[in-house]
């Protein structure tokens, strides 16, 4: 299934990768140059990043599994004690296989992969897909985490989980974290995320994810929601795990009912 066409400014600041090469890569994913877009996909010597040109004070968005927040979370975070780890059912030696069907910037998936789960990523937005692909390729080369990520974190070349076959592409857990319309205060908490939200917007068709997720999950579907959000599809989960600002709604799979 082809991605819907996305128009965005394409810029190369790299001495190694030309604008023509970036344009050709983007064309494969139906991303075209639009000089009027306030958003730009920029190739630097270090990475691929997304910028909001009309708000230059906002941070660029890019995927970095090696340093920054993710390195801190890997080294000093809760590991198996993290809420997402508990939600997917990590317990003792049990390390479920996971499909993250709304991968985004890959942060929760990275936590699960670093613990030892085998995680497959699906990302529907083509620009985010390229950011994620770029971040993974860089992480795969890292001496410290490259090997474990090559084993445990893989981006699938599909853009919706309804393209996966429940008979062959199943997993123990399907994880969903659809973008939700933010309350104004929470939208301003992480200013760098405003760039991401401007690109992606809310997942208005998020309800369409639950049925294919239930078909793919052998054990459970985990849906991450803001604490004020309604249930996905209006469907009551079997149970929920609550954190300070979010909750994880958990739907047990057919084999667990």
UniProtKB/Swiss-Prot annotation:
Its EC number is 2.1.1.242. It holds the Pfam family SAM_MT. S-adenosyl-L-methionine binds at residues 107-108, 123-124, 177. Gene3D superfamilies: Vaccinia Virus protein VP39 (3.40.50.150), YhiQ-like domain (3.40.1630.10). GO terms for molecular function: rRNA (guanine-N2-)-methyltransferase activity. Its main location: cytoplasm. The keyword Cell division does not apply. It is found in: Cytoplasm. Keywords: Cytoplasm, Methyltransferase, rRNA processing, S-adenosyl-L-methionine, Transferase. One of its GO terms (cellular component) is cytoplasm. It catalyses: guanosine(1516) in 16S rRNA + S-adenosyl-L-methionine = N(2)-methylguanosine(1516) in 16S rRNA + S-adenosyl-L-homocysteine + H(+). InterPro entries: 16SrRNA_methylTrfase_J, SAM-dependent_MTases_sf. The keyword rRNA processing applies. Belongs to the methyltransferase superfamily. RsmJ family. Specifically methylates the guanosine in position 1516 of 16S rRNA. This is Ribosomal RNA small subunit methyltransferase J. It comes from Haemophilus influenzae (strain PittGG).
């Amino acid at each position: 299934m082809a991605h819907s066409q996305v128009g965005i400014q394409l810029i190369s600041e790299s001495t190694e990768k030309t604008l023509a090469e970036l344009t050709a890569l983007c064309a494969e994913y139906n991303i075209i140059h639009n000089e009027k877009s306030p958003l730009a996909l920029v190739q630097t010597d270090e990475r691929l990043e997304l910028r909001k040109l009309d708000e230059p004070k906002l941070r660029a968005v890019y995927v970095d599994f090696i340093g920054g927040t993710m390195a801190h979370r890997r080294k000093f975070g809760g590991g198996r004690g993290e809420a997402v780890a508990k939600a997917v059912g990590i317990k003792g030696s049990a390390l479920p296989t996971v499909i993250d069907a709304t991968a985004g910037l890959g942060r929760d998936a990275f936590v699960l992969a670093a613990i030892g789960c085998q995680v497959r990523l699906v990302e529907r937005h083509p620009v985010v897909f390229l950011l994620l692909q770029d971040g993974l390729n860089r992480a795969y080369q890292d001496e410290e985490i490259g090997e474990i990520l090559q084993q445990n974190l893989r981006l699938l070349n599909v853009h919706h989980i309804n393209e996966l076959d429940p008979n062959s592409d199943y997993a123990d857990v399907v994880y969903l974290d659809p973008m939700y319309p933010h309350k104004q205060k929470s939208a301003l908490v992480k200013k760098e995320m405003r760039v991401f939200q401007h690109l992606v917007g809310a997942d208005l068709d998020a309800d369409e994810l639950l049925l294919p997720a239930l078909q793919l999950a052998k054990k459970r579907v985990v849906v991450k929601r803001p604490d004020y959000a309604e249930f996905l599809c209006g469907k009551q989960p079997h149970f929920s795990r609550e954190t300070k600002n979010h909750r994880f709604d958990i739907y047990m799979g057919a084999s667990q009912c």
